Amino acid sequence: MRATPLAASADVSCRKKPLEFDDNIDAKCPVLKRVRDEPEPGPLPSLLPPSPPPASDLSPAVAPATRLGPYILLEREQGSCSYRALHCPTGTEYTCKVYPASEAQAVLAPYARLPTHQHVARPTEVLLGSRLLYIFFTKTHGDLHSLVRSRRGIPESEAAGLFRQMASAVAHCHKHGLVLRDLKLRRFVFSNCERTKLVLENLEDACVMTGSDDSLWDKHACPAYVGPEILSSRPSYSGKAADVWSLGVALFTMLAGRYPFHDSEPVLLFGKIRRGTFALPEGLSAPARCLIRCLLRKEPSERLVALGILLHPWLREDHGRVSPPQSDRREMDQVVPDGPQLEEAEEGEVGLYG
C-alpha cells in the first residue's frame, strides 16, 4: 500500500530524475510490451478458482478473472492495487500490480535506474495497455510484518540474518540514487517457502535522485516509521537518513515485538517521535542495543548510513539465541497490531502530520 502523504507546501514536489528508457534502462529490466487491457473471455483454471472481492473493491483497475495476454488476473489482494495472476502456459502464479497507464514512466523509473540485486524484487514482465500498466512479480511467501506479529518478536540470531538482507537492499538503493521513503516491515517479503530470504517487495514511492543531494520536501511516510525531521517545520530533510530511521524502527520492532513509539492518538504518537526517546527491552545484547541507538538518532546527521549498518559488529558476529523472556512479552502493550493500523494510515490522519 502506498504511504500516506503528509501535509507539505503545495508548490514543492518530490525531486525525481526524468527517465529516458532507451539510454538508462538496465539490461535485465523487462521490456515493456503493449497489450489490450479490455477483458477477454477465457476458461478459468479449475485448480485456482477465483474469489472475487466485492464490486466496490475493484476500482481502479480490472474485474476479477480478466484475461490479459498469457495471464489471467484472479482476485485482488485486499487494500492494494495487486492481483493474483496465473500464467496459463506454465501454471505459474505471479503477483500483478496495476497502475494507470499515465504513471508508467514514473513507476518504471526506479527499476530502470537500479541494477539487479538479490534482495530487491524485480518485475518479470511489464505490460502496457491503453488505460493501465501491469507489472508482474514472482510470487512471494508472506511478509516480515506478519512474521513478527505472529511471534511477538524474533530472536537476535534470526533477526540479524534478516535485517542484514534489509540493510543490504537499502544500501544498494541509496548507492544508485534511490530514496525509498515508505520503508516498513510489510515492504519486505519472503522469496522462499522457508522464510529465510527477504526481498524489498517493490520500488513503489521511491524517488530517483539527481546527484549526491538527497533532500526531499514532500512529507511522505507511515505514522509508526516516520522520522522526527519529517514532523518538524524544516522545509526539507535527508531522504536517505529518513530511510535509515525507518530501518531502526523496523529493527526495534523485530527484536521487541512492539514499536519504539506508539500511541492510539496520532498527535500523541508524533509527539513521542519528535522527542525521540524510547526504552529498549530487556534481554538484548549490547551490540544490538548499540545498533538500534545508532539508527534512531533524533539528529539525522548522527545516524549511520545504510552501508555503515552492514559494517556494524552486530551484523558481523555469530549470534546466540537471545530474546526477551516470554513473560515480559505478554506484558507489553505496544505489540505489533493485528491489522494495518499504524502501517497503513487512514486518510483522516493526514492533516495531523503538519
Swiss-Prot record:
Keyword annotations of the record: Apoptosis, Nucleus, Protein kinase inhibitor, Transcription, Transcription regulation
Superkingdom of the organism of origin: Eukaryota
PROSITE patterns (alphabetical): PROTEIN_KINASE_DOM
Tissues where this protein is expressed: Highly expressed in liver. Not detected in heart, brain, spleen, lung, skeletal muscle, kidney or testis.
Bias type Acidic residues, positions: 341-354
Domain Protein kinase, chain residue ranges per copy: 68-315
Signals that turn on the gene: In liver under fasting conditions and by thapsigargin. Expression is activated by ATF4 in response to stress.
Region (Disordered): 36-61, 320-354
Similarity comment: Belongs to the protein kinase superfamily. CAMK Ser/Thr protein kinase family. Tribbles subfamily.
Biased composition (Pro residues): 41-55
GO biological process, one term: regulation of MAP kinase activity
Localisation per UniProt entry: Nucleus
GO CC annotation, single: nucleoplasm
SUPFAM superfamilies: Protein kinase-like (PK-like)
Role played: Inactive protein kinase which acts as a regulator of the integrated stress response (ISR), a process for adaptation to various stress. Inhibits the transcriptional activity of DDIT3/CHOP and is involved in DDIT3/CHOP-dependent cell death during ER stress. May play a role in programmed neuronal cell death but does not appear to affect non-neuronal cells. Acts as a negative feedback regulator of the ATF4-dependent transcription during the ISR: while TRIB3 expression is promoted by ATF4, TRIB3 protein interacts with ATF4 and inhibits ATF4 transcription activity.
GO molecular function: ATP binding; enzyme binding; protein kinase binding; protein serine/threonine kinase inhibitor activity; transcription corepressor activity; ubiquitin ligase activator activity; ubiquitin protein ligase binding; ubiquitin-protein transferase regulator activity
InterPro entries: Kinase-like_dom_sf, Prot_kinase_dom, Tribbles/Ser_Thr_kinase_40
Subunit structure and binding partners: Interacts with AKT1, AKT2, MAP2K1 and MAP2K7. Interacts with ATF4. Interacts with DDIT3/CHOP and inhibits its interaction with EP300/P300. Interacts with APOBEC3C. Interacts (via N-terminus) with APOBEC3A. Interacts with RELA.
Listed Basic and acidic residues bias regions: 320-333
Region of interest (Interaction with DDIT3/CHOP), residue spans: 1-127
Organism: Mus musculus (Mouse)
Protein name from the UniProt record: Tribbles homolog 3
Xref: PANTHER family: SER/THR PROTEIN KINASE-TRB (PTHR22961), TRIBBLES HOMOLOG 3 (PTHR22961:SF14)
Gene, per the UniProt record: Trib3
Signal sequence segment: none
Domain-level remarks: The protein kinase domain is predicted to be catalytically inactive.
